[in-house]
Amino acid sequence: WVRARGHDSYWRFHRDQFLTLVPPPGKLTLDVGCGEGRLPRDLKRLGHRVIGVDSSSTLIEAARRADPGGDYHCASATKLPLESASCDLVIAFMTLQDVDELAAAISEMGRVLVASGTACIAIVHPLNSAGKFENESADSSFVIAASYLDEFGYTDDIERNGLRMVFHSKHRPLEAYSRALEASGFIIDAIREHRIPEEGFRSGRSRRWQRIPLFLHVRAVSRRSLDTTRIVSRS
């Protein structure tokens, strides 16, 4: 699925939208939940020194095959194999909606970041995961039948062009992510809710997603960097 270039939203629009939030290359970039490594490879082409981490040994092996010179490790998002304050950028692209321990994963992201570090996050938009369209028409109503404010697991089984992918994820309200970031010393710097661009449409039914965001992008900075700035300015 992810290795079929042009097959999913990553290739058609999602990567380019997300990269507008990512700062320029610095000391070290960590991709948490790197999968088979397509984002680390793109980041390397942009000049980033990247380490990729994923809990799936199968995906890590695929990443190593696709990028023999890359730095990939099989590890949990809640126990990252890096020293504290070793990265200046941590990316979690379409990862955090799939982890069971959200607070622990974000805490680990904060631990490995330097004081001036940045976290860039992409998730399934909580509005998207809470509900669904009633039908495939472009003007279909979008209905939230359950509670947006409750956390629950869900499964998406999708087949397209002969390729099948089963996603097992968790719906969480936006506040759950905000609170986890706050508890780990982050301040949200930017939030983006992109529409699908015209060139991203695969079919007429895709136009439904011009009214409801598919994804949520968040950039957060370490509160410690702000505290340091205040200390320097007073000295």
Q: Residues of each region from the PLM?
A:
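A short acidic, Gly/Pro-enriched loop at the edge of an enzyme's catalytic core
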Residues: 78-89
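Acceptor-substrate binding/catalytic loop of class I
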Residues: 127-130, 162-175
